Amino acid sequence: MNTTVAEAGIQNHPVVSGDRWLAQRKTLLAREKELMRLHDQVARERRALPWERIEKNYVFDTPDGKRTLAELFEGRRQLLVQHFMLGPDWAQGCPSCSYMADHTDGMNVHLAQRDITFVAISRASLAEIARFRERMGWQFKWVSSSGSDFNYDFHVSFTPEEQATGQVAYNYGKLPFPMEEAPGVSVFYKDDAGDVFHTYSTFGRGVEVMMGAYSLMDLTPQGRNERDVPNKMEWVRHHDRYEPAPAAKPAAAHACCASNG
């Protein structure tokens, strides 16, 4: 059955009685519950995926010196990695990755309570990372994979030779990609013996799991307001580069109020 529903426009949007609104809201609620149950089922299937053992000894530059992947866990069992697009000699990080990262500092205390350490990883030097991190005002841990195969092995950085073919390995397929760096989120687990396992990675739109603002936008009448934008995220800026948001418009006078002027 085709369940596609065309989006109603803001102009001339249907306005109905309270009873009819409630009836349609309950219909949507059933769909929302269906989606939530599917979400829960997919999460169970994600946790049930087999793991792959990390055999390579990845070493990262951190503010505390050289650290292995196992040491990035900081005593916890689970490591959540944002593959942040900030390449060597870049003037600044990717705006979309920055939009993701803007959600991070507030959630880290909660992640730690569930045995999860968060870290961002980029190929830029530690000095380049520190400069951009300070500009953004972020506090989360961010390390450099410079000199390591880590980014290449997890298919979020591409060699000139790979790019020259016109097809790179990204998001579990071969596709054209316009840049040498790509976004992603990866998850790792460390057992009692200290062995590290790769349990999950997501790319492309999968990284929206870190974009909580999108979830709130999806509740509003205009949604993400990206339908007429060729590149859906081209509106995103670094949080210190937005033009001032439009001022709230004064409420229009109701007809009965206007007549009392």
Regions found by a protein language model. Name each.
Residues 112-129:
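Catalytic nucleophile loop
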Residues 1-114, 131-137, 141, 148-261:
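Non-globular targeting/processing and membrane-anchoring segments
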Residues 122, 144-146:
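Residues at the C-termini of beta-strands that transition into short coil/loop
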